[in-house]
């Protein structure tokens, strides 16, 4: 279905391939029906897609980048009609119905799908941040970033996009991690806020972000020093069922 075009640090970029799509479905129509039912069941029930039928958490970051929660195939179609050329999936490639349907929709509507793995409950690694920098420098055309709910990983990457690619102040970038997007900083997901908080005083003293990342930042220290709150973790993990 998809052909690997390029690999960045932790990133796989897939381009539409008509020939491989034909090969996948050739002579297996009955199997395709069963697979399609399974994929839609996983997307709607296991992945809580029914909650996203009318709630898309869709927001424009700037003229070239949008953020949202996990799109359905119909939303991929709508994005393509709006001029979106690249969809960045922050959940990484997965062997489940949601990923399969998204990948197939991207092939159908001529959208490039990028799989990039970001974490919502861990201090960002230096490798991930550099991978994000390379990704932002590589993608072409209007793009859409998404995770499952569009709250935490989408917020992290949106903030990095503004900080790294658009060279905005950390105070502006950090606004992408906000409750209005569904982000709860009192939970373990607050590690993402702590990451930007840790850089802010060094920015005030004139230190460039990547100088701080290379010479000062220690993800283990940040991880071990962060204290989340039990009620917030129960909300995010048990009630909202975030990844």
Role assignments for model-derived ranges:
Residues 4-143, 156-243:
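Cys-dependent protein tyrosine phosphatase-like superfamily
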Residues 147:
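Short cysteine clusters
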């Amino acid at each position: 279905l998809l052909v690997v075009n390029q690999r960045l640090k932790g990133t796989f970029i897939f381009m539409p391939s008509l020939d491989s799509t034909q090969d996948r479905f050739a002579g297996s129509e009955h199997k395709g029906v069963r697979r399609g039912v399974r994929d839609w069941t996983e997307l709607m029930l296991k992945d809580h897609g029914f909650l996203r039928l009318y709630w898309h958490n869709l927001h424009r970051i700037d003229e070239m980048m949008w953020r949202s929660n996990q799109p359905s195939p119909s939303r991929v179609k709508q994005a393509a009609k709006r001029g979106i050329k690249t969809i960045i999936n922050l959940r990484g490639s997965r062997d489940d119905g949601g990923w399969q349907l998204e990948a197939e929709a991207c092939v159908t509507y001529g959208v490039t799908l990028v799989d990039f793995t970001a974490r919502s409950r861990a201090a960002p690694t230096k490798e991930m941040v550099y991978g994000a920098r390379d990704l932002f420098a590589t993608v072409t055309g209007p793009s859409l970033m998404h995770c499952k709910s569009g709250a935490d990983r989408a917020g992290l990457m949106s903030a990095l996009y503004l900080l790294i690619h658009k060279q905005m102040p950390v105070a502006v970038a950090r606004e992408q991690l906000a409750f209005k997007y569904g982000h709860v900083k009192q939970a373990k997901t607050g590690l993402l806020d702590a990451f930007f908080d840790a850089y802010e005083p060094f920015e005030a003293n004139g230190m460039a972000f990547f100088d701080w990342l290379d010479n000062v930042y220690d993800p283990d220290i940040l991880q071990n020093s962060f204290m989340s709150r039990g009620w917030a973790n129960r909300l995010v993990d048990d009630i909202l069922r975030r990844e």
